[in-house]
Amino acid sequence: MDLKKAVAFLCEKLQVVETDIFKIEQIHSGFTNFSFFCELKDHSKFQIRLSRKDVILDRRNEQIILQLVEPFFSNPFVYFDVTTGNAIKRWIEGTQPKRATDLFLCRLVESLKKVHSVDWKPFANELLIFDPLVYFEKTKLSAFYKRLYLNLTKKHIDIPKTLCHHDATFDNLVWTPKKQVILIDFEWSCVDNPYYEIANIIREELTIETANKLIDIYGGLKRKLVFETVIYVLLFAFQWTEIMPQTEAILNYRKWVEKRLEYFLKALFPSIWKQAQKNS
């Protein structure tokens, strides 16, 4: 992404001129957005988000969710284009954690439970309700994994639904100097259930040992179902990579998803792994 586009966007929306900018740099090239850090000469700091045009997201859904979670995390956005997803938000000081300490996991759970406590039902007609079969008809998963996936989705039918961040990986949060977890980037957020939320963090970030700590800290979850949901989420992630633009980054991510699937199946569900190999 051309840095000049970020500069022009910032100047237009904040009504500043280029000479007001002290520093600007690209900090992230994600699957859906390009992100830039900018500091003005008056020391105010911002993050600029420019959306990829080849990935369509429901930005109205994101906008509503930002309003719903504002009492917990405030709303850092100073400009938000609900049509394009392009945005500018105040910079939140902090880092992404290098490892999941017990304190970090506790603070992460506290933040997740705030999201899960939100009364979303008044907005039920506007919010995205997670559909695990949204990509299923197009997937190239093997017949064995298709059957497994369908069986796993059925286990979630009767689980009470909550608002979920749905992508609370370490890239999508800030670990502040005050040792608090601020959740950011709600663009994939939707109504689902805490099992998916916790499983998605596990499949992206954690070893089985640390995953067990997270499950214990959250409390009230059936351990086996959480790890079954990890498999379910990994199979969903594989399907997601199939419908995204087939860039090198997406293809590499798919390989990583396959490695994580192998890791969890071999360690926790060896009989399923053996069946998968026989049917591959």
Curated annotation (Swiss-Prot):
An annotated GO cellular component: cytoplasm
Gene3D superfamilies linked to this entry: 3.90.1200.10, Phosphorylase Kinase, domain 1 (3.30.200.20)
Any GO BP annotation: phosphatidylethanolamine biosynthetic process
Matches recorded under InterPro entries: Aminoglycoside_PTrfase (IPR002575), Kinase-like_dom_sf (IPR011009)
Domain of life of the source: Bacteria
GO function terms (MF aspect): ethanolamine kinase activity
PANTHER family: CHOLINE/ETHANOALAMINE KINASE, ETHANOLAMINE KINASE
Listed name of the protein: Uncharacterized protein MG356
Organism of derivation: Mycoplasma genitalium (strain ATCC 33530 / DSM 19775 / NCTC 10195 / G37)
